[in-house]
UniProtKB/Swiss-Prot annotation:
InterPro entries for this protein: aa-tRNA-synth_I_CS, Arg-tRNA-ligase, Arg-tRNA-synth_N, Arg-tRNA-synth_N_sf, ArgRS_core, DALR_anticod-bd, Rossmann-like_a/b/a_fold, tRNAsynth_Ia_anticodon-bd
Gene responsible for this protein: argS
Protein name: Arginine--tRNA ligase
Reaction equations catalysed: tRNA(Arg) + L-arginine + ATP = L-arginyl-tRNA(Arg) + AMP + diphosphate
Transit peptide is among the record's keywords: no
HAMAP family (UniProt xref): Arg_tRNA_synth
Subcellular location: Cytoplasm
SMART domains assigned to the protein according to its UniProt record, in alphabetical order: Arg_tRNA_synt_N, DALR_1
UniProt motif 'HIGH' region: location: 126-136
One Pfam family linked to the record: Arg_tRNA_synt_N
An example molecular function term from Gene Ontology annotations: ATP binding
Family (UniProt): Belongs to the class-I aminoacyl-tRNA synthetase family.
Length: 581
């Protein structure tokens, strides 16, 4: 409905250009918003106020001219001017009912699909050689949710798990294995079964011994140069580490697979060419032995230029080098229209610099959109970054296990007579869903406080509340026998039916915001509001005890659409639904 009103306004603006009311080359981004007060209609635009200056008319006069020029539409019952020149649209109830009727048998719930694009999504991307921790949660689940929404809307999505499988940490592991083998021979291999402790011991040696640190850096260069021994060990480290990652992905219900892994090492053969191409364009400068690029737009507080380091003095490469190679690959080989990076907000400057450099060096097509969709931090209840009681990093698998234990206690307390197998399965879904939803429901760019107590509550905007809301709606159909809605028609008579219908009709525009802005929290808020709208409808409008069969079947269709929308919305967030709680 929103897109329909935008289309009417675009046609009106085009007519204004032809009539000379506004310049022929005038461009405007027409904004249509949902009204907060239903007495002001369903949708509103400030187009008249946007055109005041170029048209040389007062906004109310322009608003009336817009109304007079609008093409006729069966969807619009009436149009009014409000305040200084807002234009309010009242949607025809029968047109809304028709829109909902079309959604009943449509796998996309009546959503008009956009022109498909090829979208590369870079998310999760943990550094290998150690276990995933809570700091990896946000990129992994926010990225996965946006990927699901993109695919649902018909886009071609290429997942890229740009794991950190190259660099100093592998030099440390190689050097440590070298030391252990010198002492223990091939038996040293057994210690790799606990990669986390192996990494911790290597890091301790790196920090304590300058000689060890030098050797580790040398081994990184040898690894990057293709040394056979280093590469064999490196593959073993990677395989063990990736196995840990994919156990976590499976537990989280994340759609990443081994086929999606395209880490830093994938671009190793391209790094030398990146340096040569930048040099050939006269972009490289030598600074303290390193090869760097300075861009005029990037300076520090003192006004000094900030470098993008491309190659270190010892010949090693950095994140910027592999990022540039990846951007070129994603533009020229994968033919991406958009590339989305779900990486911590603290990396904003890095991405601004490399995006700018990639365009400057013509490594990427001009029409390809590079987007850093950064996120804030997950903090403990003290407001500081989430840590263990001893101050250590919380392993993601430990967090999920605690969520499962707490969810099991909660579900058991509410269902003391339920069998253990069912309890365990419900607790698994509730625990994982609670962790994911608590994160996804927060604005991506905000920091948030992690609280098991809040996320496992059945009140408010939480996973348990929405999972229960879905079972409540779906439960209606368990009480109906011989249901046949094939000839049923949606009719919106009661105010609460209209409110629910309006909310259901917004699903498409909500998903557009999720994929355009990378904001799953908008979908979470919508699902919470939809559950509330259904609750109000259910209290005011008897479904199974309706006045007649036509009314009952109409309300059953509204309930069915609500259940499908809740289920699809939760699934797009990567959350399973339950048939009982």
């Amino acid at each position: 409905m929103k897109s329909h009103i935008q289309s009417l306004l675009e046609q009106t603006l085009e007519s204004f250009k032809q009539q000379g009311i506004v310049p022929a080359d005038f461009e405007a981004r027409i904004q249509v918003d949902r009204t907060k007060d239903k007495s002001h209609g369903d949708l509103a635009t400030n187009l008249a106020m946007m055109l005041t200056k170029v048209a040389g008319k007062n906004p109310r006069e322009l608003a009336q001219l817009i109304i007079d020029t609008l093409p006729a539409s069966a969807y619009v019952a009436k149009v009014e001017i409000a305040g200084p020149g807002f234009i309010n649209f009242f949607i025809n109830d029968s047109a809304l009912a028709d829109q909902l009727q079309n959604a009943v048998n449509d796998e996309h719930l009546g959503i008009k699909l956009p022109t498909p694009q090829t979208v590369v999504v870079d998310y999760s991307s943990p550094n290998l050689a150690k276990e995933m921790h809570v700091g990896h949660l946000r990129s992994t689940i926010i990225g996965d949710s946006v990927v699901r929404a993109l695919e649902f809307l018909g886009h071609k999505v290429i997942r890229q798990n740009h794991v950190g499988d190259w660099g100093t940490q592998f030099g440390m592991l190689l050097a440590y294995m070298e030391e252990l083998r010198a002492k223990n021979g091939e038996k040293a291999q057994l210690e790799l079964s606990d990669l986390e402790n192996f990494y911790r011991a290597a890091k301790l040696r790196f920090d304590e011994s300058a000689e060890f640190a030098t050797r580790a850096r040398q081994l990184v260069v040898e690894l990057q140069s293709g040394d056979e021994y280093c590469n064999k060990l490196w593959r073993e480290f990677n395989d063990i580490s990736l196995s840990h990652c994919h156990e976590v992905y499976a537990r989280l219900g994340v759609s990443l697979t081994r086929a999606d892994v395209h880490g830093e090492s994938a671009y190793n053969a391209d790094l030398e060419q990146v340096v040569k191409d930048l040099d050939a364009q006269g972009l490289l400068t030598e600074s303290n032995g390193a090869k760097v690029v300075f861009q005029e737009a990037f300076r520090n507080k003192e006004g000094e230029p900030l470098p993008v380091i491309i190659q270190k003095a010892d010949g090693g490469y950095l994140y910027a080098t592999s990022d540039l190679a990846a951007m070129r690959y994603r533009s020229n080989v994968l033919k991406a229209d958009r590339v989305l990076y779900f990486v911590d907000l603290r990396q904003a400057l890095h991405f601004q610099q490399v995006f700018s450099l990639a365009k400057l060096a013509k490594f990427v097509r001009e029409d390809m959109s590079l987007e850093h969709l950064g996120f804030g931090t997950m903090n403990g209840e003290d407001g500081r970054p989430f840590k263990t009681r001893s101050g250590g990093v919380v392993k993601l698998v430990d967090l999920l296990e605690e969520a499962n234990v707490r969810a099991l206690e909660l579900v058991r307390s509410k269902n003391p007579d339920m069998d253990e197998v069912t309890l365990t399965e419900i607790a698994r879904v509730v625990g994982i869903s609670a962790v994911k939803y608590a994160d996804l429901s927060k604005n991506r760019t905000s920091d948030y406080i992690f609280s098991f107590e809040q996320m496992l509550s059945f009140e408010g905007n939480t996973a348990p509340y929405l999972l229960y809301a879905y079972t409540r709606v779906a439960g209606i159909f368990k009480r109906v026998t011989d249901l046949d809605l094939s000839q049923a028609k949606i009719v919106l008579e009661h105010e609460k039916e209209k409110d629910l219908g309006n909310k259901l009709a917004q699903f498409g525009e909500i998903l557009s915001r999720v994929v355009d802005k990378g904001q799953p929290h908008v979908l979470c808020a919508y699902l919470y509001e939809l559950a509330g709208a259904f609750s109000s409808f259910y209290e005011a409008c008897p479904v199974l005890a309706a006045d007649n069969d036509a009314q009952k079947n109409s309300r059953l269709l509204l309930a069915q659409l609500t259940a499908r929308t809740l289920q699809k919305g939760l699934n797009l967030l990567g959350i399973e639904t339950l048939e009982r709680m």
